[in-house]
């Protein structure tokens, strides 16, 4: 299992602290996996302009940065980590509040925060489809209410044949654990 946490600047925009609940969920999920499913693995990655893996012990100290949202970089790293694991339970939980706004093209950042940029969106959707072909389900936890962003998440979810939850910050943890349990049981049977 890979948990992707969005640390782009929008995670603290407009007076809403979305990063603190995301960190709490990540810590609780890691505890659940370690105690109830000790044979499973949990890799935690964060993504902004780039994506990188962090240690579980570093989750409480996560901070957002002046980053855009490079969902592609996060998915690429998650896929790479899952390919190296022998566990049958290959899934990605992605906590995000917004649209993808950044990719790397020809070694340079290509960014666009205005609307949904088709170049960025198409690359993101292509990776969602590639995850599906590899048997990697993506569960997206959307913690923003914008209808056009929800439409993007719906398209992303359909492409991957994964799941999406549109949730408030309060109910975020319940959704993750319910879905993890459901996926876990299905993979064990």
Cite the ranges covered by each PLM segment:
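Von Willebrand factor
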Residues: 1-56, 59-95, 100-102, 139-148, ...
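Residue-level signature of catalytic and energy-coupling elements of molecular machines
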Residues: 26, 78, 157
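Von Willebrand factor type A / integrin I
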Residues: 82-87, 99-102, 106-189
């Amino acid at each position: 299992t890979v948990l992707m946490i969005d640390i782009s600047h929008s995670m603290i925009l407009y007076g809403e602290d979305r990063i603190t609940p995301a960190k709490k969920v990540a810590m609780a999920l890691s505890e659940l996996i370690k105690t109830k499913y000790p044979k499973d693995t949990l890799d935690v990655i964060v993504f902004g302009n780039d994506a990188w893996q962090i240690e579980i012990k570093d989750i409480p100290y996560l901070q957002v940065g002046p980053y855009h949202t490079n969902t592609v970089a996060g998915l690429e790293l998650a896929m790479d980590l899952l390919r190296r694991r022998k566990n049958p339970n290959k899934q990605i939980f992605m906590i995000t509040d917004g649209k993808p706004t950044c990719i790397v093209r020809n070694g340079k950042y290509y960014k666009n925060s205005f609307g949904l940029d088709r170049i960025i969106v198409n690359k993101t959707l292509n990776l969602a489809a590639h995850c599906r072909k590899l048997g990697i389900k993506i569960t997206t936890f959307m913690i923003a209410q914008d209808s056009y962003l929800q439409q993007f998440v719906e398209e992303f979810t359909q492409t991957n044949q994964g799941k999406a939850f549109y949730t408030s910050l309060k109910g975020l943890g319940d959704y993750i654990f319910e879905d993890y349990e459901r996926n876990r049981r299905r993979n064990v049977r």
